[in-house]
A protein has these predicted regions:
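Catalytic core of Fe(II)/2-oxoglutarate
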Residues: 70-147
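Short, solvent-exposed loop/turn segments at secondary-structure junctions
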Residues: 21, 25-27, 38, 54-56, ...
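Hydrophobic/aromatic-lined pockets within catalytic cores
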Residues: 2-6, 54, 115
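A structural signal for short, well-ordered beta-strand segments
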Residues: 18, 49, 107-111
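Catalytic core of non-heme Fe(II) oxygenases with the double-stranded beta-helix
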Residues: 29-85, 104, 118
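Signature of the catalytic double-stranded beta-helix
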Residues: 1-27, 32-34, 38
Length: 147
């Protein structure tokens, strides 16, 4: 996570705990079209991470645009063990009704270098807020897709 935050940062602020999301076959969309900048306590420097624990494709996946304002929405296709990092602060994303026979179980969180964290990230270490962690070098990121 740390290298995706840019530069030689030594510490990163990470959303804790990650959000777990479930979508059963036949369930409606879980979140509408949005970018994270509309929510309080989100900074432009944050990097979104999405980790599906089940195969995701077509309507049981997250849909997003390739760059801010592109409006070229497409579903993300990933297998368990793969992750997606993306600019959710500026790129719009959403889900649709799950018309597949596969449930979606996923985790998502945001991370930002400590030096770029906005002043509203003050409750470090509290449940449901953020954690300050030491950065470590990447050993292998071949299972990470970036948008």
């Amino acid at each position: 996570v740390a290298p995706s935050c840019g530069g030689a940062t030594q510490r990163i602020v990470v959303q804790m705990p990650p959000t777990i999301r479930l979508s059963l076959p036949g369930s409606p969309a879980t979140i509408g079209l949005h970018s994270d900048q509309v929510y309080p306590n989100h900074t432009a420097a944050e990097v979104n991470w999405w980790l599906p624990l089940t195969p995701v494709y077509e309507s049981n996946s997250l849909w997003l645009e390739s760059r801010p304002g592109a409006e070229d929405y497409r579903p993300v296709t990933l297998s368990p063990g793969e992750a997606l990092r993306f600019n959710g602060h500026e790129c719009r994303h959403f889900t649709v009704a799950n018309e597949t026979d596969t449930s979606r179980v996923s985790l998502d969180w945001r991370a930002v270098p400590e030096e770029l964290a906005c002043g509203t990230l003050t409750r470090i270490g509290e449940f449901g807020e953020v954690a300050l962690v030491e950065a470590s070098p990447v050993v292998d990121d071949h299972n990470v897709q970036g948008v």
